[in-house]
Amino acid sequence: MGKKAVCIISGGMDSALSAKIAQEEGYEIIALHFNYGQRTRNKELECFRKITQELNASESYEIDLDFFEQIGASALTDKSIDVPIGGLEEGVPVTYVPFRNGIFLSIAAAIAEKHGAEALFIGVVEEDSSGYPDCRESYIEQMQKAINLGTKDETNIEIKMPLVSLRKSQIVQKAIELGVPLEDTWSCYQAEDAACGVCDSCRLRLRGFEVAGVKDPIAYRK
């Protein structure tokens, strides 16, 4: 039997590349997507399905986590909080979803244990990102310890973060090199028809393409 990896795929560029790297490393892909009440859930799900098909994933999970809307406290899940469009600022932005990656990784670990998967792949980026605390490498390493303490003795899961120290321009270049369908990825926090171009995530993406010297294949409003 070949080795298996659960890949958390949001539909964005980073997670699509992370999953492609897992495939390149010889893992059988178990694709995992979360609908957590985010503003662009429909577009993200559409992109996830296209990416999963391109990866020829052996299994695909679409998990609904409606409780994130009940918790709120994030511009991504609470429509009473505006998505910032003024550029990146210091500190943790209002687009941070409380403990999202911790919850995602816990569910991914349960699926990995079910399938006997050796690895979880997550496309967190620490250096060139929005500054979310649950994207830090040190945090993910501690989650790996907790997961392996809280699962069966024979379960040994490694959480892989292949992009954690890359800049967005390097992610763009690597994605093109590996043939990731960037036209089927979505980064915008607030629009589903054409990307807004002004939220933090759009700015980071556009800057990455600009520095890489490549045109972004998706449509933008401005």
UniProtKB/Swiss-Prot annotation:
Any matching Pfam family: QueC
Reactions performed catalytically: 7-carboxy-7-deazaguanine + NH4(+) + ATP = 7-cyano-7-deazaguanine + ADP + phosphate + H2O + H(+)
The keyword Nucleotide-binding belongs to this UniProt entry's keyword annotation: yes
Binding site residues for ATP: I9, S10, G11, G12, M13, D14, S15, A16, L17, S18, A19
Ligase recorded as keyword: yes
InterPro entries found in the cross-reference section: QueC (IPR018317), Rossmann-like_a/b/a_fold (IPR014729)
Coiled-coil blocks: none
Function description: Catalyzes the ATP-dependent conversion of 7-carboxy-7-deazaguanine (CDG) to 7-cyano-7-deazaguanine (preQ(0)).
Protein name: 7-cyano-7-deazaguanine synthase
Species this chain originates from: Sulfurovum sp. (strain NBC37-1)
Name of the gene: queC
